[in-house]
Amino acid sequence: MQREFSKQVASAALDFFNSRQGKMLALVRALVETESASGDLEGSRAVVQLLAETAREIDGVTSVERIESPNYGEHLRVRAFTDAPESSGTVLLIGHTDTVHPRGSLQERPWRASDGRIYGPGIFDMKANCALAVEVIRALAALNLAPRHAVTLLLTCDEETGSATGRALVEAEARRAHSVLVLEPPAPGGRVKTARKGTGIFTIEAHGIAAHAGLEPEKGASAILEIARQIERLHAMNDPSRGITVNVGVVHGGTRSNVVPAEAEAEIDLRFSTAEDAKKLEAAILGARPFDERVKIKVRGGVNRPPLERTEKVAKLFELAREVAAQLDFELGETAVGGASDGNFAAALNVPVLDGLGIDGDGAHAIHEHIIVDDIARRGALLTGLIASL
């Protein structure tokens, strides 16, 4: 470690988060009960206001910015410890304030505590972790663990719908960063994510020739048949051994069963583990040619999130996190996952990224979404120790 995170300091960090747990959970509850589905402008701004007001109270915080996002609400950027001695880059904390749960979900599934768990729409992904990020900055100041690197917390408001306005902010801050820590939920068992697949979304349209299916089918050129052949070609690109999945999840076409269909389309989800595969697969999909020369095809879309690869830099960052966890008397695991996050954008800029650092729980995007209360202090102390050790 560059700075020793001793057992004594680890114990103090745990004590801090345990002592603050009630106040932190009050903030989490306020966030959960302020619904903020992607695109809910009022909800987004209200959530950001709660977090901004809390951040402004913390020693070490030098600026709190509410950044307008057209059609989505507001992003939040908090800068802290800007007088830190190390000039090689910031420690960037990334999260998001939007959820997949539409307004009204809270009425159906209100805040509920049961058996050491707290349930509520968006609590696991990831409103509890937004609150945790602010508490970690508070802990660094309160425990006199001012980090060597300035800290930037960036919470975007459109991650769940593809980061249309947040991506540029993430990339701009990542270019200034020494390390990026993503507070997305962990994998089962609290494992952090050292690799994430990249994603691509495509649509293939086929424009054929309509004809009567009984009287003169030979005059028709079936758009549905063309799409079916394209689907077989796409399916052949799957390679589980390399982490490549190509899924045609939606197909539309035709008008009536007795008409050779003139129009059809398919929607494609692409997942890949390396940037090299991303380029090849994107070119192969966009370069599709019709099997029937009478049919015209058009392909739209492309890669929208690069992969987070487990590079040597990522492995080194994970090893540091493991050392901090050991001082907290637990073993930190790692895994690779198929879903993407805003951390993928940072990883594409060759910055070390450690993802899945949020509070353990389950049920992201589901009706049983919850966090595990006993993991709050441990996760907060882990993040505090990791930032202090960089």
Where are the regions a protein language model picked out?
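Metal-dependent amide/peptide-bond hydrolase catalytic core
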Residues: 1-12, 36, 46, 66, ...
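Acidic/His- and Gly-rich active-site-bordering loop/insert found
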Residues: 2-121, 142-143, 147, 343
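Phosphate-handling active-site elements
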Residues: 86, 114, 136-152, 233-243, ...
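Short beta-strand segments
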Residues: 94-95, 154-156, 181-184, 205-207, ...
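Acidic-glycine-rich active-site phosphate/pyrophosphate-binding loop
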Residues: 98-114, 177, 181, 195-205, ...
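Short, conserved micro-motifs enriched in small and acidic residues
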Residues: 118-131, 160, 221-224, 370-377
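Acidic/histidine-rich catalytic neighborhood of metal-dependent amide-processing enzymes
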Residues: 126-197
